[in-house]
From Swiss-Prot:
It is found in: Secreted. It comes from the Eukaryota. Belongs to the glycoprotein hormones subunit beta family. This is Follitropin subunit beta. InterPro entries: Cystine-knot_cytokine, Glyco_hormone_CN, Gonadotropin_bsu, Gonadotropin_bsu_CS. Glycans are attached at N25, N42. Disulfide bonds join C21-C69, C35-C84, C38-C122, C46-C100, C50-C102, C105-C112. GO terms for biological process: follicle-stimulating hormone signaling pathway; G protein-coupled receptor signaling pathway; regulation of signaling receptor activity. The gene is FSHB. Gene3D superfamilies: Cystine-knot cytokines.
């Protein structure tokens, strides 16, 4: 019985104390205005949960920073969007996460909104395979 209780407590501790922020494969819609359509690209990004709390009493002397699962390291890859007109710039550079961590969302490089457009949003509505 004690081993069952220990396993239960260990699992609870792991769920609360350990972050599950990790690399995951996603598909994003890539669009170039000059081309007039979107293509799908597979890339790697960060997803998961981070320990956070929302205090009832907001202390103005201590900022309340909500941590989110975000990239720690990035590389950039470039792809050629097929089917663009010859005069159009058909190269598209996009970020690929190589390491993740729980930290403050950097609004200079990341969409930190609660409900963004999402990675598969295409403003043209036309998705090429």
């Amino acid at each position: 019985m004690k081993s069952v209780q220990f396993c239960f407590l260990f699992c609870c501790w792991k769920a609360v104390c350990c972050n599950s922020c990790e690399l995951t494969n996603i598909t994003i819609a890539v669009e170039k205005e000059e081309c007039g359509f979107c293509i799908s690209i597979n890339t790697t990004w960060c997803a998961g949960y981070c320990y956070t709390r929302d205090l009832v009493y907001k202390d103005p002397a201590r900022p309340n920073i909500q941590k989110t699962c975000t990239f720690k390291e990035l590389v950039y890859e470039t792809v050629k969007v097929p089917g663009c007109a010859h005069h159009a710039d058909s190269l598209y550079t996009y970020p690929v996460a190589t390491a993740c961590h729980c930290g403050k969302c950097n609004s200079d490089s990341t969409d930190c909104t609660v409900r963004g457009l999402g990675p598969s949003y295409c403003s043209f509505g036309d998705m090429k395979e």
